[in-house]
A protein has these predicted regions:
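Nucleotide donor/acceptor-binding cores
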Residues: 67-69, 90, 133
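Alpha-helix termini
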Residues: 53, 87-91, 146
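Flexible, active-site-adjacent loop/turn segments at secondary-structure boundaries
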Residues: 39-40, 49, 77, 122, ...
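S-adenosylmethionine
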Residues: 81-83, 93, 97-202
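Conserved beta-strand/loop positions that form the S-adenosyl-L-methionine
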Residues: 73-75
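Class I SAM-dependent transferase core
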Residues: 2-67, 71, 100-117
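Conserved SAM-binding loop of SAM-dependent methyltransferases across substrates and taxa
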Residues: 77-89
Length: 202
């Protein structure tokens, strides 16, 4: 299981100008794969290829965040939040209530020497205030549910960015959400993107 990282990862990292992060993301993929044997991080039958695809999908969110602070709701195995931090973001919060998943996230932060990203074991509905610039999430809940929970806790020029399939995006209200196609689509062979919502503009 210690084969070279797939060419698709290399292409993705070149596209977002982060080719130097290939080694770390390969290590991360292997950690997810190994821990998943005993901890339910991702789908039980996930292959290493599946995990690399999650990483590639997450990596293409990075250009929309850069150095803005973020909170990843339902971080789970670290998609997309931990990937964003490995790529170089210095101000993140991984929101994950489950003990085993939170332990995995803390292990990875320590392993990769990421000091300014924290793990918070809470649910979104139990937060008093969201201070980060961007709320991100992947496969946590329906966009409308996340929107209704988060909007009460946000103020100022903040935004929500959710990783979705094109089919998910079609179902959402275009007056609320802006759909941004992901550059990962052509690499993964499926149409994915991001739903963007800015509460201050409503």
């Amino acid at each position: 299981m210690h084969a070279e990282a797939p060419e698709s990862l290399k292409v993705s990292l070149e596209e977002i100008s982060k080719p130097e992060k290939e080694k770390e993301l390969k290590e991360f993929a292997l950690k997810v794969f190994d821990w998943n044997k005993t901890t339910n991080l991702v789908s039980k039958n996930s292959t290493l290829e599946n995990i690399y695809n999650h990483i590639i999908d997450s990596a293409h969110l990075y250009p929309y965040i850069q150095d803005n602070s973020y909170i990843d709701v339902g971080s789970g195995a670290g998609f997309p939040g931990l990937v964003i931090s490995i790529l170089g973001n210095k101000d993140g919060c991984l929101l994950e209530p489950a003990n085993k998943k939170a332990s995995f996230l803390r292990h990875c932060l320590a392993h990769f020497g990421i000091q300014n990203t924290k793990v918070l074991q809470k649910r979104l509905e139990h937060l008093d205030l969201i201070k980060e610039d961007v709320l991100i999430s992947r496969a946590f809940a329906e966009p409308k549910k996340i929107q209704s929970l988060a909007i009460k806790k946000m103020s100022g020029d903040q935004k929500i960015l959710l990783m979705v399939s094109e089919q998910q995006a079609i179902r959402e209200d275009k007056n609320d959400w802006k759909y941004i196609p992901s550059a990962a689509s052509k690499i993964l062979g499926k149409k994915t993107g991001f739903l963007e919502f800015n509460p201050s503009k409503k």
